[in-house]
């Protein structure tokens, strides 16, 4: 609690003093201050919120001589405004009225009940169904000389309770953040660690929050253990410091304990296949190069029936395990699902999964005591459906360890289900304040209060009949409204028959309204019964939430099993629908893909040409040549994607596939600059190449696309040659090396482990047809002009390019220029041409009649125009011959 000096309150109203105390505790956070049916913001917060949310900024009076600027949002619509602010990286403190206005002296008591930040979201309205939200803290470890030796990371998915730790090299921070993708990053005040731009909203917290000893103890307390040896975290001092800051911050935002954070996983970078930011981007795993969500590998694979499954699938794609054991277990389960008997078919299983609620996030809200009535009814209905789901699984678990494990984990917590069934109404209201949440029969007192409220109608009918008989007033009516409560209405002409015990309540133009002692007694009982029923229901609901807390571990176990089952079923559906096969694994060096296909591209086109890809101990680098648009990049990407899919545990788009160990996948594909970072296209290219050359191992898969094209021809060729040699001689990795430098096709003569392959194409007139087939050997032509023509480059430009190309080819032939490219003939053909140097030189300039013919569009010619053109062409030919041209 921040203490303000008395001078800070001088001249302020009591309510403003209350607000200023609260704001002082949340200086960098927007404070939503509850006033009646609105959340109000004041002063600078009001100005900022008005700008960000397009709210009306008002001004009401002054406090201590300062105009009070205000902006507000309705309490019933607050979630949509919170969602917008969080998306912008803002944090919001929700300040509620906790006192009773009727009994309060001075301002109603208020306090901040929670702080909504980008990394601590749990409300369904604020969360994306298919994306996890992580809060991450980072703590740098230093040696005795003050040099940074590692960075400890701790990250938490508050919605599920998943907590993870890792320690990384300082230069691996960007890669780690790209993999985790935190929504919010906690760093210490004064820390100099450079967080990559766009990595997440950055929150500075006091440096003492990262104290290692305190963090270790806080982590032990959270996990209810004496030490961290059992988790393998006892030596991760920097990560423990980060975990301490993270847990302190997360608990403060929620205003309570994190009861569902009861497990810890330590991640090791050698546990997963390494994917740096460039690789994740270039392979378009979960986001296209244009920044859209589709078409990507994730969008193709995600046919999950639950949101839990969709989130787990995303996690698997970004965390492919290096060990093939996990992949083989998953593929074994997929095979069992595909071979399931008719009564437990894959379709029937997936149909049952579609009825499953988001148990993972409901459990998180339950642990934070923020679960809503329909969360509990959804949890109840899901648990009730588990026995039938397990029956389907039990019919197909044979020889599938993963399914056996899932089946065992899906045993519903019986006591939890009994409590939910007895306590929660079949179809509860959305909010507890609306009533109708607690089931009838759960609490006798609540049932009695409800009976009083619900039986008002019959009592009024009976009273009206009795009073008509007693008074003889046939048109007497007993009614109710919110302003005056219950009353007996008598028309003006019948008032002389009114008994003495009638007391006037309201006079109208044509009638009088009365109340009797009996009606007054009932009114007090009925109105208080409704209020008491809502209060009783609120108390009972809070009791149910408390009673459910012991079942959180069981709920988390069920959620994890359901998510895994859903992903496996989605993999099986994709394998069946898209004709994919189960890959195999070997401990030997090599990759064998027969008739492989790019999974995403294949789904976008009518026909896809499948291709083989083979690596081994004697074949480590493939030099890929061929025309632009011929399919080189697609072939390279599909090889990497098929490998990644295999290690994730999916079937793959191929006739067959076998993989040896893979530790990392690198890509250097495409051209893009980094203007904000002050890096040119070529600098970006070289930076990515440097990372590959420094880190690739014999078990790495490397994709190099047209390296060296961002500088002069000779510089680029020299770099490409040297990089290819280094990858072969030093790194020894699997390499797909696409290039337009024909000189590189001589590399296999020096290194037998290199091989040439090319993407074929055929000319058709002045056009080109891409065959997209990968063949052994180098290409002999680039077809650059034909591709330019396909792209719509104007015909005059194409003609000029052809003329200059002919000139360059002639110059190259006569001067024996060492600079060659794919416009040139292959070496053997070039040698034959040089042997014929005594032959008459061929003019580089085309015949004028041919030029004229190329400009003709026959469809636009009339018969007379065609005849005139024929004479013109004859004149051109004769004139050309007369000038002595051959």
From Swiss-Prot:
GO biological-process terms attached to the record: mismatch repair
Coiled coil: none
PROSITE patterns: DNA_MISMATCH_REPAIR_2
Binding residues for ATP: 626-633
InterPro entries: DNA_mismatch_repair_MutS, DNA_mismatch_repair_MutS-lik_N, DNA_mismatch_repair_MutS/MSH, DNA_mismatch_repair_MutS_C, DNA_mismatch_repair_MutS_clamp, DNA_mismatch_repair_MutS_core, DNA_mismatch_repair_MutS_N, DNA_mismatch_repair_MutS_sf
UniProt entry keywords in alphabetical sequence: ATP-binding, DNA damage, DNA repair, DNA-binding, Nucleotide-binding
Similarity comment: Belongs to the DNA mismatch repair MutS family.
Function: This protein is involved in the repair of mismatches in DNA. It is possible that it carries out the mismatch recognition step. This protein has a weak ATPase activity.
Annotated PANTHER family: DNA MISMATCH REPAIR PROTEIN MSH1, MITOCHONDRIAL, DNA MISMATCH REPAIR PROTEIN MUTS FAMILY MEMBER
Identification of the protein by name: DNA mismatch repair protein MutS
Organism of provenance: Burkholderia ambifaria (strain ATCC BAA-244 / DSM 16087 / CCUG 44356 / LMG 19182 / AMMD)
């Amino acid at each position: 609690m921040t203490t303000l000096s008395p001078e800070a309150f001088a001249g302020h109203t009591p309510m403003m003093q209350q607000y200023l105390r609260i704001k002082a505790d949340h200086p960098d956070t927007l404070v939503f201050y509850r006033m009646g049916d609105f959340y109000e913001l004041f002063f600078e917060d009001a100005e900022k919120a008005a700008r960000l949310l397009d709210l009306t900024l008002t001004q009401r009076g002054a406090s201590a001589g300062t105009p009070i600027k205000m902006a507000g949002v309705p309490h019933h619509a607050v979630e949509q405004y919170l969602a917008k602010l969080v998306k912008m990286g803002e944090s919001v403190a929700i300040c509620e009225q906790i006192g009773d206005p009727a009994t309060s002296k001075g301002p109603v008591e208020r306090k901040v009940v929670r702080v909504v930040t980008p990394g601590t979201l749990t409300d369904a309205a604020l969360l994306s169904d298919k994306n996890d939200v992580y809060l991450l803290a980072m703590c740098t470890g230093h040696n005795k000389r003050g040099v940074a030796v590692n960075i400890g990371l701790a990250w938490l998915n508050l919605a599920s309770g998943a907590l993870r730790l890792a320690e990384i090299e300082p230069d691996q921070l960007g890669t780690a953040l790209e993999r985790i993708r935190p929504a919010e990053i906690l760093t210490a005040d004064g820390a100099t660690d450079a967080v990559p731009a766009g990595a997440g909203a950055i929150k500075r917290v006091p440096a003492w929050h990262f104290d290692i000893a305190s963090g270790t103890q806080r982590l032990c307390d959270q996990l209810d253990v004496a030490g961290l040896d059992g988790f393998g975290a006892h030596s991760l001092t920097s990560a423990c410091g980060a975990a301490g800051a993270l847990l302190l911050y997360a608990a403060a935002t929620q205003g309570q304990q994190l009861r569902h954070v009861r497990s810890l996983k330590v991640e090791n970078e050698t546990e997963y296949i390494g994917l740096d930011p460039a690789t994740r981007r270039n392979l378009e795993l979960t986001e296209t190069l244009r920044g859209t969500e589709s078409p990507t590998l994730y969008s193709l694979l995600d046919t999950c029936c639950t949101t839990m499954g969709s989130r787990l699938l995303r996690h698997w794609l970004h965390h492919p395990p290096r060990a093939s054991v996990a992949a083989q277990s998953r593929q074994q389960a997929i095979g069992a699902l595909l071979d399931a008997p008719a009564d437990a078919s894959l379709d029937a299983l997936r149909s049952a999964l579609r009825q499953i609620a988001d148990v993972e996030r409901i459990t998180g809200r339950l642990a934070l005591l923020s679960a809503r009535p329909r969360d509990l009814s959804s949890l109840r209905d899901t648990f009730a459906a588990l026995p039938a789901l397990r029956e389907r699984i039990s019919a197909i678990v044979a020889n599938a360890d993963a399914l056996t494990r899932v089946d065992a984990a899906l045993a519903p917590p019986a006591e939890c289900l009994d409590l939910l069934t007895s306590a929660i109404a079949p179809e509860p209201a959305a909010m507890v304040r609306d009533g109708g949440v607690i089931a009838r029969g759960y609490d006798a007192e609540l049932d009695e209060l409800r009976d009083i409220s619900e039986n008002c109608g019959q009592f009024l009918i009976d009273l009206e009949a009795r009073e008509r008989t007693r008074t003889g007033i046939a048109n007497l009516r007993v009614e109710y409204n919110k302003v005056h409560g219950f009353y007996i209405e008598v028309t003006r002409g019948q008032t002389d028959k009114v008994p003495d015990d009638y007391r006037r309540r309201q006079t109208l133009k044509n009638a009088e309204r009365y109340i009797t002692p009996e009606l007054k007694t009932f009114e007090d009982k009925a109105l208080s019964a409704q209020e008491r029923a809502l209060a009783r229901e609120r108390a009972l609901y809070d009791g149910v939430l408390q009673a459910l807390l012991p079942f959180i571990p069981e709920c988390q176990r069920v959620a994890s099993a359901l998510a895994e089952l859903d992903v496996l079923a989605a993999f099986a559906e994709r394998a069946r629908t898209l004709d994919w096969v189960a890959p195999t694994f070997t401990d030997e060096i090599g990759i064998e893909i027969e008739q492989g296909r790019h999974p995403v591209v294949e789904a976008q086109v009518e026909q896809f040409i499948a291709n083989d890809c083979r690596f081994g101990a004697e074949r480590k680098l493939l030099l890929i040549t061929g025309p632009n648009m011929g399919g080189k990049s697609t072939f390279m990407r599909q090889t990497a994607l098929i490998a990644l899919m295999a290690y994730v545990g999916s079937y793959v788009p191929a006739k067959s596939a076998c993989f040896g160990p893979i530790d990392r996948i690198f890509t250097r594909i495409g051209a893009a600059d980094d203007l904000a970072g002050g890096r040119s296209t070529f600098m970006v290219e070289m930076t990515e190449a440097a990372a590959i050359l420094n880190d690739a191992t014999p078990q790495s898969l490397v994709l190099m696309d047209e390296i060296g094209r961002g500088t002069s021809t000779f510089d680029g060729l020299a770099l490409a040659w040297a990089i290819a040699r280094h990858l072969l001689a030093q790194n020894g990795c699997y390499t797909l090396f696409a290039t337009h430098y024909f000189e590189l096709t001589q590399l296999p003569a020096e290194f037998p482990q290199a091989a040439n392959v090319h993407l074929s194409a055929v000319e058709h007139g002045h056009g080109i047809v891409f065959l997209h087939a990968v063949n052994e050997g180098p290409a002999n032509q680039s077809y650059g002009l034909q591709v330019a023509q396909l792209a719509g480059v104007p015909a005059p430009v194409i003609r000029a390019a052809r003329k200059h190309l002919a000139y360059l080819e002639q110059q190259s032939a006569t001067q024996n220029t060492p600079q060659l490219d794919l416009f040139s003939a292959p070496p053997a053909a070039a040698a034959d041409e040089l042997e014929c140097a005594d032959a008459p030189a061929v003019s580089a300039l085309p015949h004028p009649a041919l030029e004229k013919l190329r400009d003709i569009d026959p469809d636009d010619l009339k018969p007379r125009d065609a005849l005139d053109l024929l004479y013109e062409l004859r004149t051109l030919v004769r004139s050309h011959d007369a000038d002595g041209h051959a």
